[in-house]
Protein backbone atom coordinates (compact mmCIF):
# COMPACT_ATOMS: atom_id res chain seq x y z
CA UNK A 1 0.00 0.00 0.00
CA UNK A 2 2.76 2.45 0.95
CA UNK A 3 4.68 1.56 -2.20
CA UNK A 4 1.62 2.29 -4.35
CA UNK A 5 1.14 5.62 -2.58
CA UNK A 6 4.79 6.51 -3.18
CA UNK A 7 4.46 5.89 -6.93
CA UNK A 8 1.24 7.92 -7.03
CA UNK A 9 2.94 10.77 -5.18
CA UNK A 10 5.94 10.64 -7.53
CA UNK A 11 3.60 10.68 -10.54
CA UNK A 12 1.67 13.66 -9.14
CA UNK A 13 4.93 15.48 -8.47
CA UNK A 14 5.97 14.92 -12.07
CA UNK A 15 2.54 16.09 -13.23
CA UNK A 16 3.01 19.61 -11.87
CA UNK A 17 2.98 21.68 -15.11
CA UNK A 18 5.98 23.96 -14.49
CA UNK A 19 5.82 25.54 -17.94
CA UNK A 20 2.14 26.37 -17.57
CA UNK A 21 2.59 27.85 -14.08
CA UNK A 22 5.64 29.95 -15.00
CA UNK A 23 4.04 31.09 -18.25
CA UNK A 24 0.96 32.33 -16.40
CA UNK A 25 3.02 33.97 -13.65
CA UNK A 26 5.73 35.55 -15.82
CA UNK A 27 3.86 36.52 -18.98
CA UNK A 28 0.20 35.85 -18.28
CA UNK A 29 0.05 33.32 -21.13
CA UNK A 30 -0.68 29.64 -21.60
CA UNK A 31 2.41 28.33 -23.43
CA UNK A 32 0.28 25.53 -24.89
CA UNK A 33 -1.23 28.21 -27.12
CA UNK A 34 2.17 29.47 -28.33
CA UNK A 35 5.20 28.10 -30.14
CA UNK A 36 5.09 24.33 -30.47
CA UNK A 37 2.24 24.09 -27.97
CA UNK A 38 4.38 21.85 -25.76
CA UNK A 39 4.58 22.32 -21.99
CA UNK A 40 8.28 21.51 -21.85
CA UNK A 41 11.37 23.62 -21.33
CA UNK A 42 12.20 24.11 -25.01
CA UNK A 43 8.88 25.76 -25.74
CA UNK A 44 9.17 27.72 -22.50
CA UNK A 45 12.48 29.18 -23.70
CA UNK A 46 10.98 29.89 -27.10
CA UNK A 47 7.85 31.63 -25.82
CA UNK A 48 8.85 33.03 -22.44
CA UNK A 49 12.53 33.92 -22.90
CA UNK A 50 15.76 32.75 -21.31
CA UNK A 51 15.03 33.81 -17.71
CA UNK A 52 11.57 32.27 -17.44
CA UNK A 53 12.70 29.28 -19.51
CA UNK A 54 15.54 28.70 -17.06
CA UNK A 55 13.07 28.65 -14.18
CA UNK A 56 11.01 26.02 -16.00
CA UNK A 57 14.12 23.89 -16.57
CA UNK A 58 15.10 24.17 -12.89
CA UNK A 59 11.58 23.26 -11.77
CA UNK A 60 11.41 20.28 -14.12
CA UNK A 61 14.80 19.02 -12.92
CA UNK A 62 13.69 19.47 -9.31
CA UNK A 63 10.58 17.36 -9.92
CA UNK A 64 12.70 14.41 -11.00
CA UNK A 65 15.20 14.86 -8.17
CA UNK A 66 12.56 15.11 -5.45
CA UNK A 67 10.69 12.10 -6.80
CA UNK A 68 13.87 10.02 -6.77
CA UNK A 69 14.50 11.12 -3.17
CA UNK A 70 10.99 10.16 -2.02
CA UNK A 71 11.88 6.56 -1.02
CA UNK A 72 14.61 7.87 1.30
CA UNK A 73 12.43 10.68 2.65
CA UNK A 74 9.49 8.37 3.36
CA UNK A 75 11.64 5.38 4.38
CA UNK A 76 10.03 3.09 1.81
CA UNK A 77 12.04 0.33 0.14
CA UNK A 78 11.70 1.45 -3.47
CA UNK A 79 14.66 2.07 -5.76
CA UNK A 80 15.06 5.83 -6.42
CA UNK A 81 15.25 5.27 -10.17
CA UNK A 82 11.83 3.61 -10.21
CA UNK A 83 10.27 6.45 -8.23
CA UNK A 84 11.93 8.83 -10.68
CA UNK A 85 10.44 7.04 -13.66
CA UNK A 86 6.98 7.61 -12.17
CA UNK A 87 7.70 11.35 -12.11
CA UNK A 88 8.93 11.26 -15.71
CA UNK A 89 5.70 9.58 -16.78
CA UNK A 90 3.81 12.24 -14.83
CA UNK A 91 5.71 14.97 -16.65
CA UNK A 92 4.92 13.49 -20.06
CA UNK A 93 1.31 12.65 -19.22
CA UNK A 94 0.32 15.11 -16.47
CA UNK A 95 -3.04 14.63 -14.80
CA UNK A 96 -3.11 18.38 -14.10
CA UNK A 97 -2.79 19.31 -17.79
CA UNK A 98 -5.07 16.88 -19.61
CA UNK A 99 -2.25 14.32 -19.94
CA UNK A 100 -0.39 16.47 -22.47
CA UNK A 101 3.02 17.33 -21.08
CA UNK A 102 6.62 17.87 -22.03
CA UNK A 103 9.27 15.59 -23.45
CA UNK A 104 10.84 14.85 -20.06
CA UNK A 105 14.47 15.66 -20.83
CA UNK A 106 14.94 17.92 -17.79
CA UNK A 107 12.89 15.71 -15.46
CA UNK A 108 14.86 12.64 -16.53
CA UNK A 109 18.03 14.59 -15.82
CA UNK A 110 16.69 15.41 -12.37
CA UNK A 111 16.24 11.73 -11.59
CA UNK A 112 19.87 11.09 -12.52
CA UNK A 113 20.98 14.10 -10.47
CA UNK A 114 19.70 12.27 -7.40
CA UNK A 115 21.10 8.86 -8.31
CA UNK A 116 24.29 9.64 -10.27
CA UNK A 117 25.30 13.31 -9.80
CA UNK A 118 28.49 12.88 -11.85
CA UNK A 119 26.50 11.44 -14.74
CA UNK A 120 24.11 14.39 -14.52
CA UNK A 121 26.98 16.90 -14.66
CA UNK A 122 28.52 15.21 -17.70
CA UNK A 123 25.07 15.14 -19.33
CA UNK A 124 24.72 18.89 -18.90
CA UNK A 125 28.19 19.47 -20.37
CA UNK A 126 27.52 17.14 -23.30
CA UNK A 127 24.12 18.74 -23.94
CA UNK A 128 25.57 22.24 -24.17
CA UNK A 129 28.42 20.98 -26.35
CA UNK A 130 25.94 19.47 -28.80
CA UNK A 131 23.78 22.59 -28.56
CA UNK A 132 26.74 24.83 -29.35
CA UNK A 133 27.61 22.69 -32.37
CA UNK A 134 24.13 22.03 -33.78
CA UNK A 135 21.98 24.90 -32.39
CA UNK A 136 19.12 22.37 -32.21
CA UNK A 137 17.71 21.77 -28.72
CA UNK A 138 15.82 18.70 -29.90
CA UNK A 139 18.82 17.06 -31.56
CA UNK A 140 21.03 17.91 -28.59
CA UNK A 141 18.51 16.27 -26.26
CA UNK A 142 18.44 13.10 -28.34
CA UNK A 143 22.23 12.91 -28.65
CA UNK A 144 22.62 13.52 -24.93
CA UNK A 145 20.20 10.68 -24.24
CA UNK A 146 22.24 8.36 -26.44
CA UNK A 147 25.44 9.48 -24.71
CA UNK A 148 23.85 8.77 -21.33
CA UNK A 149 22.84 5.29 -22.45
CA UNK A 150 26.41 4.50 -23.52
CA UNK A 151 27.78 5.97 -20.27
CA UNK A 152 25.43 3.82 -18.20
CA UNK A 153 26.75 0.65 -19.85
CA UNK A 154 30.13 1.24 -18.23
CA UNK A 155 28.64 1.52 -14.73
CA UNK A 156 27.65 -2.17 -14.64
CA UNK A 157 24.45 -1.04 -12.91
CA UNK A 158 21.83 -3.06 -14.77
CA UNK A 159 18.86 -1.11 -13.42
CA UNK A 160 20.50 2.18 -14.38
CA UNK A 161 21.14 0.84 -17.89
CA UNK A 162 17.52 -0.31 -18.21
CA UNK A 163 16.04 2.94 -16.89
CA UNK A 164 18.31 5.16 -18.99
CA UNK A 165 17.57 3.11 -22.13
CA UNK A 166 13.84 3.35 -21.35
CA UNK A 167 13.97 7.11 -20.80
CA UNK A 168 16.10 7.68 -23.89
CA UNK A 169 13.66 5.67 -26.01
CA UNK A 170 10.83 7.84 -24.69
CA UNK A 171 12.79 11.04 -25.36
CA UNK A 172 13.51 9.97 -28.95
CA UNK A 173 9.87 9.00 -29.49
CA UNK A 174 8.61 12.28 -28.05
CA UNK A 175 10.93 14.15 -30.44
CA UNK A 176 9.74 12.30 -33.55
CA UNK A 177 8.14 15.41 -35.07
CA UNK A 178 11.33 17.38 -34.35
CA UNK A 179 13.37 14.72 -36.13
CA UNK A 180 11.15 15.07 -39.18
CA UNK A 181 11.55 18.86 -39.11
CA UNK A 182 15.34 18.54 -38.82
CA UNK A 183 15.35 16.29 -41.89
CA UNK A 184 13.09 18.78 -43.69
CA UNK A 185 15.30 21.66 -42.47
CA UNK A 186 12.33 23.41 -40.87
CA UNK A 187 13.30 22.88 -37.21
CA UNK A 188 14.11 26.25 -35.58
CA UNK A 189 17.62 26.77 -34.27
CA UNK A 190 18.38 28.65 -31.08
CA UNK A 191 19.76 32.15 -31.41
CA UNK A 192 20.71 33.13 -27.87
CA UNK A 193 23.89 31.02 -27.81
CA UNK A 194 25.25 32.86 -30.81
CA UNK A 195 24.43 36.23 -29.27
CA UNK A 196 21.62 36.91 -31.75
CA UNK A 197 18.26 38.19 -30.56
Curated annotation (Swiss-Prot):
Protein source organism: Bacillus licheniformis (strain ATCC 14580 / DSM 13 / JCM 2505 / CCUG 7422 / NBRC 12200 / NCIMB 9375 / NCTC 10341 / NRRL NRS-1264 / Gibson 46)
Residues in coiled coil: none
EC number(s) stated in the UniProt entry for this protein: 2.3.1.275
Main location: membrane
Keyword Nucleotide-binding: no
Name this protein carries in UniProt: Glycerol-3-phosphate acyltransferase
Chain ranges passing through the membrane: 2-22, 69-89, 111-131, 153-173
Topology with respect to the bilayer: Multi-pass membrane protein
Amino acid sequence: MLIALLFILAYLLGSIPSGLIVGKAAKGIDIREHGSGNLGATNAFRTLGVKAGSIVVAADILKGTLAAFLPAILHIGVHPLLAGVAAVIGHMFPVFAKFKGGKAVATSGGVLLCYQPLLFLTMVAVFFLFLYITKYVSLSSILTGLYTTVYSLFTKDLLLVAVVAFLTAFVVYRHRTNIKRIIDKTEPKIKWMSGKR
